Amino acid sequence: MRQENGAAHHSDGLPWWLLDMRPQGYLGRAYAVRYGAELGLPGSLSDWTDTHALRALLVHGHDVVGNLLLGEMARERFLSAPPPTPVPMAEKAGHYVQLAAEAARGDTPGSSAGGEQPKFTTFAETPDGPRHVIVKFTEPVDGLVSERWSDLLLAEHLALETLREAGVAAARTRVIDHGQQRFLEVERFDRVGAAGRRAIISLGAFDAEFVGSGRDRWPIVVRRLSASGEIRSEAADEADLLWAFGTLIGNTDMHLYNLSFVSEHGRPYGIAPAYDMSPMCFAPRSGGGMADTIQKATIHSDVSNETWRLAGQLARDFLARIQRQSVFSRRFDPCLHSLTQHIEAASVQIAKLG
């Protein structure tokens, strides 16, 4: 890559600022199955190299995460695409059922939004106007696994709502139920209006280039990024709060790609709205088993006492919001009991911080 000032940078693989664009997670696997043979790529995403990912981006890179277009084909597809027609509010449930079925079959290329939860992307009417959204969904079956994911999608909605109402930037969400299926509609923050785009870089991509920790906690990585000027100091403070809140509500899925940063003019980056925030300790196990307990929270010293106190209040607000709901399944009751005890025990520890 050659910058405007003439400086040249070489990458052995995909540059760090392209890592989030490559097909990944649920949508990425579906994409590989659907388009792998057509593009001469392996049908299994796990077998892809950076060269394979780049080939996919050059062909279908007109609708991926962030604001970049790679190559003339992606640029032409973006410029020639007709204005998107938003899904009407009154037709969402039925339309989302159809889109979920297509996503499950791998029929829609969609965005490269990562994550293992089944999802699709679309453009839809919302109470605030038309928005690009990511829609997570449960399987249309009556079973323990689907029921648990339905509960967790509602919990995610309530967690993000708790953050937003406290003045913390968090993705705006809506829950839509249709028969046995639940949809969680999440507004995208890398899209502006019908065709506008915003740069977004995950903490994982930043870490790969500037830190190299691989698995460290968010607070450790963001402090190093703040010290080197890659992100704003207040972004590191906000990341600390999100990580502490997630710890207190049992979010065991706070890997480095579940936190992102945005910017209109490059470095230093500010923090993106929170997303993927749910008590994932209760997620179904790979073997189909169900968990209803939470490991004791560790009140790490790399987060300030003040931040822990604020996170504790947010966790209690989240718990109160959950307890007011009557639509969680009965089998989620033991989880709610464990969550209550977990937050109460952590609050006792936090109170000792002074």
Give the predicted meaning of each segment.
Residues 1-354:
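Phosphate/dinucleotide-binding and metal-coordinating scaffold of catalytic cores
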